[in-house]
Amino acid sequence: MVSVSGIRKVQRAEGPATVLAIGTANPPNCIDQSTYADYYFRVTNSEHMTDLKKKFQRICERTQIKNRHMYLTEEILKENPNMCAYKAPSLDAREDMMIREVPRVGKEAATKAIKEWGQPMSKITHLIFCTTSGVALPGVDYELIVLLGLDPCVKRYMMYHQGCFAGGTVLRLAKDLAENNKDARVLIVCSENTAVTFRGPSETDMDSLVGQALFADGAAAIIIGSDPVPEVEKPIFELVSTDQKLVPGSHGAIGGLLREVGLTFYLNKSVPDIISQNINDALNKAFDPLGISDYNSIFWIAHPGGRAILDQVEQKVNLKPEKMKATRDVLSNYGNMSSACVFFIMDLMRKRSLEEGLKTTGEGLDWGVLFGFGPGLTIETVVLRSVAI
């Protein structure tokens, strides 16, 4: 008679979860940050607010963003004038866009990841879909299964409204699924669209104005699995450990509410300070078991919530400027794409490491960290191990 422990052993993978493929995608509409203030105040019929426009221009300049991708074009906004007001009911129009566009761009990213993976789609056993954009029943995870033609028996997990920390959350969930289900192959898709948050300016809401200068659209797809098939699957990173922390006393620092005007949000000025004050605790908890205390000796994939956050974390940990280069490059070229951002950084890092002839996917280093920061205030920490190139 087979023992319960024997059955459980057979059901589980032997090795750690690994990243097997990465794909990214953006809407074709690319905006120039240097001229966005003019565009934004024109399309929202707010050019009479000259002082606020000047303030918004300064905010745009301080972001250190050069370009962002957005589904919303001037034509779409003209067809939906309520989306250009600060406080006009427009949720129906926004939701209709989300249900269509979030899975569409997600499919584009997923198709790229599946192609790199090199295995038939029939081997995908689980789907994790994450978005802060819109809500539907059945979810956009269902829509993606239809668009891709995935097996209807794929076990799916729909994560709505997690926010900017969720890149770490989906990895934490995927690691558990891959390591506890033999031969599991988990497709993660994070797809974000700012049509849910776009609105006109208000002199009494600087949080919204900062968001209009910072957030962008994008999707990333990742395939996670343990025990890679030799000569077929090529690991990119190993997922060593994961952790989540709700920072004490940080209630009200970051959050959002779904209203008739769309998704409204608030961003406390203390957010960069809260994150930087808690970053060393997160690092020590993650790396003390590995005997690592020099955080310049690891590679960094940090969610680019904004320039001030990166600056304060860099200063607090005494990081060399090059440690955040991949993160800052993604922020500069794409803006803040919420949950998808960390995977754009991961993709850039592994490609750049190969191009520069480094020995591992993690800038030539063995160990690294992935951080997600978001509503709560929540910090997600993922310890990564690179793979030899």
Curated annotation (Swiss-Prot):
Q: Which sites are catalytic?
A: 164
Pathway noted in the entry: Phytoalexin biosynthesis; 3,4',5-trihydroxystilbene biosynthesis; 3,4',5-trihydroxystilbene from trans-4-coumarate: step 2/2
Is Acyltransferase one of the keywords?
yes
- Residue numbers binding substrate: 55-58, 267, 305-307
Per the record, what is one GO cellular component?
cytoplasm
A GO BP annotation: polyketide biosynthetic process
Q: A GO molecular-function term, please?
A: trihydroxystilbene synthase activity
UniProt entry keywords in alphabetical sequence: Acyltransferase, Cytoplasm, Stress response, Transferase
Coarsely, its chief localization is: cytoplasm
Acyltransferase as a keyword of this entry, yes or no, is: yes
| Entry's EC annotation | 2.3.1.95
Compartment(s) of residence: Cytoplasm
Stated induction or repression of this protein's expression: By stress. Experimentally by elicitor of P.megasperma, yeast extract and dilution of cell cultures.
Catalytic activity reported: 4-coumaroyl-CoA + 3 malonyl-CoA + 3 H(+) = trans-resveratrol + 4 CO2 + 4 CoA
> What's the top EC group for this one?
transferase
Superkingdom of this protein's organism: Eukaryota
Among PANTHER family, the record links this protein to: CHALCONE SYNTHASE 7, HYDROXYMETHYLGLUTARYL-COA SYNTHASE
What binding partners and quaternary form does the record give?
Answer: Homodimer.
Q: Which family does it belong to?
A: Belongs to the thiolase-like superfamily. Chalcone/stilbene synthases family.
Q: What is the name of this protein?
A: Stilbene synthase 3
What is the source species? Arachis hypogaea (Peanut)
